[in-house]
Amino acid sequence: MAEPRVFLKENRGRIEENYLEQAKNLPRVFAPVDEKLQKCTEEVALACKYLYAFMPYSDIGNYPFEVFLDYAENGVRLWKENPQVADLPEEIFLNYVLFHRVNEEEIAQCRTYFRAEIGSRIQGMNFREAALEVNYWCAEEATYHCTDDRTLSAISVYRR
């Protein structure tokens, strides 16, 4: 029988170490975060710690914990429910699936919303098929136009 997969096994130590360093630098900010992490599953707490360990200070100061919790919960859910996601190298998963920021866009809770909007449409598809279907869905729903120096968040583009 195959050994059960451990979420972020290769990067767990690095994440914990970097999170503790951030917490040491910003103790008043991280005290309430630590309290909220205690209410999370081990996997979601580790995903949140990754986000907090590597996000810019501006994100730590400008957005509430619940925004990052949404990203963490959805990342863990994808990892648990989709073997293709779980098979990704951890660095790819951390930087391109879990992480909350692409550019300079506003950070918004959007993954739960988009999962509800498109999840059933791509269920059971392989990565290639799902990527194409998401692109078709995006073309049906929104056309992106850069309006200023900042990039709009995905949810802002969708709601236009």
Across the structure, where does each feature detected by a protein language model lie?
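Linear, non-domain "peripheral" regions
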Residues: 1-120
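Secondary-structure boundary elements
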Residues: 90-159
